[in-house]
Amino acid sequence: MSKIKLTKNDLKKQKDELKMFKRYLPTLQLKKQQLYMEIVKIENSYKIKNLEQQKLKENISNWISLFSEKFPFESWIQVKTVVKKSLNIAGVAIPIFDSIEYEDIRHDLLFTPYWVDKGIEILKVVIQIDVELKILKKQIDLLLREFRITSQRVNLFEKVMIPTAKANIKKINIYLGDQQTAAVVRGKIAKSSLIKKNRNSL
């Protein structure tokens, strides 16, 4: 931070900066609050989705155990692409899950167990939940990063920039006040000296 000059120009500069800091601080505080609320909301969504995943996997285990033969689902289900959208939250672009596109893999259903179709449907749900959880985690990471940056800025404004500007204004005001008082005193002394000089010359 540059050293302040005890001048009227610097006093105006400090007052302008203080005004700007006070105007900008509420915006930062609001952004911090919005980010916090959104993080809490997404973390709750993540917990709910995670519980859903656990229950589904338990149900799948129970369901698969009913059948003695194993089936190579990997060759039947292959993700082609995950379609995502983007949403702006308090200035942060976060990914939003949209859909999953699968490779078009064709097999002869005559030679597959009757329960495979149902199994594929369930596994697609499992895959989707996995993808959604990863995207929710990414959302939380992005928003947390911005929340930390915004919190640092709020602290900087509240604890450094605004107090420093106020202290500088006070310091300059005191100095200029002292200078003005000194000028008045010098003026009175000069006037008194002039009167004495005029009297002595008579």
Swiss-Prot record:
One of its GO terms (biological process) is proton motive force-driven plasma membrane ATP synthesis. InterPro entries: V_ATPase_D. Keywords: ATP synthesis, Hydrogen ion transport, Ion transport, Transport. Gene3D superfamilies: 1.10.287.3240. It comes from Borreliella burgdorferi (strain ATCC 35210 / DSM 4680 / CIP 102532 / B31). This is V-type ATP synthase subunit D. Belongs to the V-ATPase D subunit family. One of its GO terms (molecular function) is ATP binding. Pfam families: ATP-synt_D. Produces ATP from ADP in the presence of a proton gradient across the membrane.
